[in-house]
Amino acid sequence: MSTDYEFQGWFPFEEPINATIHHVAEVLDAPVSLDVKGNPTFRSDSLLVYSFEPKREDDRDSARTALGFDINLTLVFADYSRGEDTRMIRAVQNMIRSVISLASVPGLHAVLIEEERRDDLILLSVDDGKVTLNRKFEGWSLWPEVLAIVPEPHHFETLHILP
């Protein structure tokens, strides 16, 4: 069983799936392979990283309603550390390191969510280079070593899923 973190958003690349996976794999120094459908993916320690585009317009509409912006990609970080603290912290640090690196891409707009679209499970948002941490996400206080990955000064706000 894994804990899935989804970085959902607008990724301004000509080929979002390929460019995003290769960008993150380079950050984590991991080799990219292809899954059974021919899509790029990779594993780094206990993280499995893959991505997918919205299949139907309904999926995009749902995201637009919940997030307030259009999405063209979901980047998934599946953490298979199974609750082992050291591995889990390292996996989440690597995920945050990857997301922060993507934040520097001009025009990128996305949110990082743990498991489901709930206010308290939003970790952060990225809007054209600006990283905003969710004040309601308990992980920032529980895991100071994860927060340390985010460049200072930290900008906290209360982030919401739209009704």
Where are these regions (language model features)?
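Short, intrinsically disordered low-complexity segments
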Residues: 30-86
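Charged, amphipathic alpha-helical segments and their flanking helix caps
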Residues: 5, 10-18, 76, 80-109
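Acidic, proline/glycine-rich low-complexity IDRs
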Residues: 104-163
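Short, low-complexity, polar/charged sequence segments that are solvent-exposed and flexible
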Residues: 26-30, 93-94, 131-132
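Short, extreme N-terminal segment that most often corresponds to the first beta-strand
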Residues: 1-37, 158-163
